[in-house]
């Protein structure tokens, strides 16, 4: 079954991009095409370039030797003996440069191994290498050479590089050693949690050294060395830049992360495991909910329980459900577990927090939402998880297992009366087992990988956050993971959402495809876009026959629910058409036009 809805909306912006959202989890496939021909062409060109570089280095070396030889003659040392001394002086500088490079490499190796003793030893050796080169340039022959303009530039370049390497040692490596000594990474994990003090020590270190690294790397790449040593510059800068390679990816989320963990003071967050098989506009039904608690400076992830045991049965009056929300989302807003019919996750999370506080008498500082797609992404880096019934979840199958396989294993046409509760327990177990494995096997070297899972989820609304404090919530918005409706006219988006209203598990079989046509510029400068949203039920006859009512719902496999389409901020919706003859109604929610 497939239903199409065609709408035209006008965007008051003269220009801007529009995006559609498909809020259901599934598999994503991509392919890469590699051209062997271009690879070989590039390789041949590179070899030719290297040949030219060798010739150029040889010319520079001859020129350098000639200049030094002339200087020796000028100070009374001539002939073959003078040339021999000149050659030795140049060779000494080159050898000292290679020693410097090796010592810097040892510093980086020590840091990578998180070995403060090895790093400090390498820093000491690096300082000696720098001092040796400076002593060489203090010789009379090099001081005389410094008076020659061209040679002066070369010597200045070498000294500039030495200063930058010295900065790398004193301003980057040694401060890192101090933190490694004061806050060894072995102290990061405390029983089943994480030390906030240790985390904050390394976050502060990264914030301190990152701009210094940027400065050093930029300055190094502008240094022009003599004697064919320019190739070393790239090696130096790459080694130093590698110190914060993961941080470069993480820094857009760093303000949010620091806000989330705070200074170690007590905090409580809800961790909602949403199930997209019962799809909702804000992700999925929150089948199980756990906690993230910070107590006495230690962050721990608590057990997960069924949403029915965790949230109050009725939405607290403090939520102040509006008449507009009742009109849009019906009676579903009366139960906090169903608040996610509202596509505005900020509102949904607030209601969940109130409902948790009412039932558990514990204040909530924020809410984090996870879906099966995020669990699958995490398993790629923490390894497989095996459930108590023997089901193995991997980075290849978790989404399908959690949204399809488990239901057809236990809730098929021959399901027992208690099978539903058993499956709910397996979902709660999945969330807890995944979080426990993340904690027990946590590897700081994989921070960049963990970030990728989080950032990818933030982009497609499979991970969302809400913070009670309004200032802290701004960090969530800036990181792009608030899950709120887009009210920014400078970044217009079309929102397409669906919520299943019948108790069933048919979300796996729902396909949503949104197409946005080319813009038509109107006389007043606004633009009109033709938007087509296609909703398809891809339930096969075989799956229908094998499924029990818990999966199929009250209508034998027919998907029923709420469709909401939001115009971009500042835009309108007109000329609504439906392929099945159904009626669509327009209205306004959070200042956005919707149907």
Task: Report each predicted region and the residues it spans.
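N-terminal targeting leaders characterized by basic, low-complexity, disordered sequences
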Residues: 1-50
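Beta-strand-rich interaction surfaces with strong enrichment in secreted/lumenal proteins
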Residues: 518, 586-591
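Long, charged all-alpha helical bundle/coiled-coil segments in cytosolic proteins
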Residues: 123, 128-195
């Amino acid at each position: 079954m497939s239903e199409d809805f065609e709408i035209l909306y006008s965007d008051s912006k003269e220009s801007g991009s529009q995006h559609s959202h498909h809020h259901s989890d599934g598999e994503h496939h991509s392919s890469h095409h590699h051209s062997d021909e271009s690879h070989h062409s590039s390789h041949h060109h590179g070899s030719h370039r290297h040949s030219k570089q060798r010739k150029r280095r040889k010319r520079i070396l001859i020129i350098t030797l000639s200049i030094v030889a002339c200087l020796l003659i000028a100070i009374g040392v001539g002939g073959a003996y003078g040339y021999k001394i000149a050659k030795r002086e140049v060779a000494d500088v080159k050898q000292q440069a290679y020693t410097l490079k090796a010592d810097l490499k040892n510093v980086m190796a020590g840091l990578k191994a998180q070995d403060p003793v090895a790093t400090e030893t390498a820093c000491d050796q690096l300082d000696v290498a720098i001092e040796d080169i400076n002593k060489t340039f203090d010789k009379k022959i090099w001081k005389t050479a410094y008076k020659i303009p061209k040679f002066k530039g070369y010597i200045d370049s070498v000294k500039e590089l030495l200063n930058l390497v010295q900065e790398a040692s004193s301003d980057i490596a040694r401060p890192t050693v101090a933190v490694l000594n004061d806050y060894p990474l072995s102290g990061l994990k405390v029983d089943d949690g994480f030390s906030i003090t240790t985390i904050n020590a390394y976050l502060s270190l990264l914030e301190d050294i990152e701009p210094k690294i940027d400065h050093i790397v930029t300055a190094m790449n502008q240094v022009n060395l003599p004697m064919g040593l320019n190739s070393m510059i790239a090696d130096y800068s790459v080694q130093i830049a590698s110190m914060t390679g993961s941080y470069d990816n993480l820094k857009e989320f760093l303000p949010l992360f620091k806000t989330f963990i705070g200074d170690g003071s007590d905090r409580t967050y809800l961790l909602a495991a949403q199930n997209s098989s019962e799809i909702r506009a804000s992700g999925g039904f929150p089948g199980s909910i756990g906690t993230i608690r910070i107590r006495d400076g230690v962050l721990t992830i608590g057990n997960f329980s069924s949403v029915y045991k965790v949230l109050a049965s009725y939405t607290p009056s403090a939520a102040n459900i509006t008449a507009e929300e009742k009109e849009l989302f019906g009676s579903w807003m009366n139960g906090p577990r169903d608040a996610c019919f509202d596509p505005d996750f900020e509102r949904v999370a607030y209601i969940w927090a109130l409902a948790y506080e009412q039932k558990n008498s514990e204040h909530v500082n924020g809410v984090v939402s996870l879906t099966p797609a995020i669990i699958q992404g995490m398993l790629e880096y923490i390894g497989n998880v095996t459930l108590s019934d023997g089901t193995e979840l991997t980075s290849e199958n978790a989404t399908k297992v959690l949204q399809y396989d488990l239901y057809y294993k236990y809730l098929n046409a021959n399901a027992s009366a208690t099978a539903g509760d058993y499956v709910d327990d397996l979902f709660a177990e999945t969330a807890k087992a995944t979080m426990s494995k993340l904690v027990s096997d946590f590897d700081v070297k994989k921070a960049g990988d963990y970030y990728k899972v989080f950032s990818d989820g933030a982009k497609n609304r499979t991970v969302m956050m809400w913070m009670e404090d309004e200032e802290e919530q701004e960090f969530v918005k800036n990181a792009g993971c608030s899950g709120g409706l887009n009210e920014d006219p400078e970044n217009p988006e079309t929102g397409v959402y669906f919520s299943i209203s019948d108790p069933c598990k048919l979300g796996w079989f729902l396909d949503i495809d949104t197409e946005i046509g080319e813009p038509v510029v109107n006389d007043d400068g606004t633009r009109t876009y033709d938007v087509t949203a296609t909703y398809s039920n891809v339930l096969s006859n075989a799956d229908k026959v094998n499924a029990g009512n818990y999966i199929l719902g009250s209508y034998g496999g027919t998907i029923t629910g709420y469709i909401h389409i939001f115009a971009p901020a500042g835009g309108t919706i007109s000329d609504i058409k439906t392929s099945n003859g159904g009626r669509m109604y327009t209205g306004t929610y959070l200042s956005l036009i919707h149907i």
